[in-house]
Amino acid sequence: MEVNCLTLKDLISRPPRLDFAIEDGENAQKENIFVDLSRMAPKTPIKNEPIDLSKQKIFTPERNPITPVKLVDRQQVEPWTPTANLKILISAASPDIRDREKKKELFRPIENKDDVFTDSLQLDAVDDSAVDEFEKQRPSRKQKSLGLLCQKFLARYPSYPLSTEKTTISLDEVAVSLGVERRRIYDIVNVLESLHLVSRVAKNQYSWHGRHSLPKTLRNLQRLGEKQKYEEQMAHLQQKELNPIDHKSGERRRDGCPDSQDPQLLDFPEPDCPSSSANSRKDKSLKIMSQKFVMLFLVSKTKIVTLDVAAKILIEESQDIPDHSKFKTKVRRLYDIANVLTSLMLIKKVHVTEDRGRKPAFKWIGPVDFSSTDDDLVDVSTPVLPELKKEIYGHVQFCAKQKLARHSSFNSEQASERTQRKVNSEPSSPYRQKQGLGVYSLEIGSLAAVSRQKMEDNSETVAFASQNMMPLPSSLDPAAPLPSPSVDSEYRVSPLCHQALSAAQTDLKALPAQNGLNGQGGVSLASMALDVEHQPQPLAAAQPLLYVPPAPLFMLCGGLQEGLSPGSGSGSGSVGGGSEVTAAEQPPMPSGQKRLSKERRLQEEEEEPATKRQCRDHEDGPLSLVMPKKPSDSADIASPKTSENRASAPHEDTHMNGQLSAAKAVSGKATTNGFVSSEWGNPCSNTEIEKPSEENESTKGPSPLQYLYVQPPAGLNGLSVLLPSSQSPHAVGLPVGPLPSLSIQYMVLPSPALSGFPVLCSPTMPGPVSSAPSPLPNVGPVNFGLPGLGSTAHLLIGPAAMVNPKSSTLPSTDPQLQGPCSLHLSPVMSRSHGSVQPGSPAYGSLPAATVKLQQSPVPVTPKSIRCTHQETFFKTPGSLGDPVLRRKERNQSRSSSSAQRRLEISSGGTD
């Protein structure tokens, strides 16, 4: 019963406890707990007694009121204070805190039950485990780092996208896909934009460019960093850190006066920030800071930059107050930039040891060597527009002259820079050009003498020839005459026989060794100022060929005439062969000025006295055929007596001594000298080419014509002069007198068809190539020299600017002026720097040369004038009418009063 009574007492006392529990649950937020405490006041001394959990079940009802001890703790945890609203705001702002509060509320209804203490312990354990799970779900600091995020960002796009591929970046989509805030993506994009890897298109829209322009951007930043003198500032700050006391006085002085470098530092000539004031937000943007941060690496000698130094430089540059808060902000922003640059593999983190310990720094591992001439030089090897060619031609030729004068085989001074500038800057004035080239004329003789002396002293002729014929490594070097025609894909032309056939390099190298000193198409080493705008062209079928880049002027001629005695001369002349090339070094002329100056040239050649002609020839003479180094203006024949002494004679004697060969002066038999001479410098001496024999078709019979081809000089009418020389040597009569004249028939052709033609020399072609359809209609090959020689060296002229081997891109014309005229040339002004004398070692093996002129069948001018009595040379539709000759006569009579009398061109031609 007693037990039951206790049970009844318990039942009687339960309702108020349940009411209290319900009231407590309903009014927990109303702080009504103090009412119960007042009722419990008499038993307060017992609440501090230790609680035995093992005896909790058998406690008497009198001791039950001590159970709300936890309620007192709740009172202290959740007071109603003015800051209670702050907790509500935090709970609303953070879902994590709100979730914690909900988890706590789940256990509150059972706090006052019998097992309240055990449940409270379980509550604490569950709460801790929930926090641990939440921490596991939250990403770590490394996972949230900007560097790792940038790597994920860069992995979405190719480093080197195709030019046709256009990639647009949406920052919203990227932020959602990567699960980060958009501001983090903005930080990455701003740094990438500073290096021009991306560009802004619209709001939150960027275009991806990749790393194509990164080297150029870094080079520009390096130049800007050098202008801003960042290297000096870094050195100053490092010295200041080492000796802080020494710099205090300097700082006080600097406070009083403004820094002289501030205007330069504020001037940031980036196209993206035209107005970069010191305190503008744009100057403090992450993009500008990134560019300046990269500049510090590029101008640093050690390529290591600490963030402290970088922050100080940027703070001083932006004229901010150097307080600690701004410094920490700068360092924090520089860390963000450094993380992105690290992801780009441009820098890496290192540690620098100082007096106070190790300090983190960053080292540049990106590209370092930026060539300063990348965007200054023009790649002339690639096909460029004609306008660009005209602009850079003078610069290329000017550089060619400088390198030519510094060649090791010469002992001459370089011409003055002012004269070179005058020559290049006034290409439209023929008279100025003659004055400009007069300075070079003093060097020509000595150069020719030196090269001739070296050739005579060298006994191993074949080795010498092969040594001189090998191309030099530099593609822009004027001394590199023989680029390989079969290597590059750009070396394409219209074939002579409408076939595109290539020659091997071994054949190309074997040709000078076989024929370099035997007169079979040797090409001078340093005579070629390579015109890189013209590229090698296709060749004839399976023949080793020699490529000569097209010079502004070509004279092509062949070997010796019949009947020459082998022992009549010593021959210091053309050991190099029957055809030589001297590249012109003058820039091309506008075509509009060529017509006027061509007629002037013919008038001056007719009317210039022999004395002035001789004096001018002394100034503008040609070089030796063997090793011409400077532009030459005429080709003549030297006597064997002067040829013997030519090597050791000074350059004045080289220009002035014995002008006629012994064969011409004594027996009328003359050598046919062939070389390519540059006529750009002296337009008045363009047609001063002496041929010892005139064309005589009746006596020579079926033998092909021999001629000299003279390409038009700069500023003239685009006319080429062809001087046939197949006339019998007995037909040449030399009158007795100090200034005898020689009557030579010549042909005037429009030069646009021949202006860009390279010369292809082959020693293996047994006969003339006449089966190919010629651009000049029915033009047979022209042979030079002895017809009875076994092998012939063929000089093939083809258009130079060919894109397709089957089609010609050069516009060509039929002859505008074809007419026989007699050129009365004075032998006194003749010179034979490149003549092959009968006694020379090259005399016996000098072959004939076949010259073919190729031209597209479409004429530039509608007129097709035909020479009636020279049908074997050029057979073209139309006829060579008298109006052309009458026009010449009018031009000659119009300028008959001129004191410069050079040539007498008669109206009637000689056969």
Swiss-Prot record:
Residues 669-687 have a biased composition (Polar residues). Residues 141-210, 281-366 bind DNA. Residues 239-281, 409-433, 565-706, 873-911 are annotated as: Disordered. It is found in: Nucleus. It comes from the Eukaryota. Homodimer and heterodimer: mainly forms homodimers and, to a lesser extent, heterodimers with E2F8. Dimerization is important for DNA-binding. Interacts with HIF1A. Interacts with MN1. In contrast to classical members of the E2F transcription factor, atypical members contain 2 DNA-binding domains and regulate transcription in a DP-independent manner. Both DNA-binding domains are required for DNA-binding and are proposed to form an intramolecular structure that is similar to the winged helix structure of the E2F-DP heterodimer. Atypical E2F transcription factor that participates in various processes such as angiogenesis, polyploidization of specialized cells and DNA damage response. Mainly acts as a transcription repressor that binds DNA independently of DP proteins and specifically recognizes the E2 recognition site 5'-TTTC[CG]CGC-3'. Directly represses transcription of classical E2F transcription factors such as E2F1. Acts as a regulator of S-phase by recognizing and binding the E2-related site 5'-TTCCCGCC-3' and mediating repression of G1/S-regulated genes. This is Transcription factor E2F7. The lineage of its organism: Eukaryota, Metazoa, Chordata, Craniata, Vertebrata.
